[in-house]
Amino acid sequence: MKIAIIGTGGVGGYFGARLLEAGFDVSFLARGEHLEAIKKNGIQLKSLLGDIQTKPCKASDKISDLGVSDVLIIGVKAWQIKEIRTELQSIMHKDSIVLPLQNGVMAADELSETIDKQHIVGGLCRIVSMITAPGCIAHTGVTPTIVFGELDHTISTRLQNLQENFKKANIHCQLSTNIETEIWKKFLLICISGLMAVTRCTYGEMNEVELTRQMMFKLLEEIYAVGIAKGIQYEPDIVARTVASFDALPYNTTFSLTRDVWEGKPSELEYQNGTVVHIGKQVKVPTPINEFIYTSLLPLEKKARTY
């Protein structure tokens, strides 16, 4: 199986390194010093599940250089999907699988605007990881997991085969017959990153202030209400269980959107709290906390995209 990792950040770098170490034919899309480091030295992975140093990687900053692949794992930021989706066809064959792992709920729909929907599966990942230096990925929290499923809710042979290959690489994975609901469950989880960005606090610091903790609950309850209005099959206790999962995270936990805002980089604001606001208006569900976060961070987002 030939696999293309489209975006070698904390997500793509982690899962790509595991697949490469297991003997799969893996190529990587990267750029700058990170690209040069992984071409020369491979990927150095520091993980709670064990460190590895891969061999030098096949990598490029051009998608077309990666070669025709059986599986394309999309690890770029959510807002970059529109930038790369047309180019993906240059490395696809008639049976290629496109597996997006983006935050948010828009990836499959945005990919299907230029790629035949039969190639696309729904997906998400759970991991706390980041680039710490060129060629270096750190996994610092959560058991790395890929959840994926057919958009028509069936269990297909092709995804059963992919699941077996993930297992060979010691990647924890789950096949879902309702991947849309699974994606919305993660969406509920990630959108607190905007609140951390506004407060400029780690999860532990933010959680110590009761008023801010209550704001977090309200933020999640808004997403729950929007999801229910969209037909998502949320369990009634999902908000409480989501907060319980937050409370088990390390004190200094941050999410990628949070770090991007703090560092003055373009972020996934539009695909997280912004999406809650936009869909909320479509389904006529008020989202005042998410709207406050979204509008508060918009000037910083605009500034980050100006440079």
Residue ranges and their predicted role:
Residues A17, E21, T86-S90, E113, ...:
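Short, well-ordered alpha-helices that flank and scaffold nucleotide-derived cofactor binding pockets
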Residues E33, W79-Q80, V105-M106, T154, ...:
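Short alpha-helical
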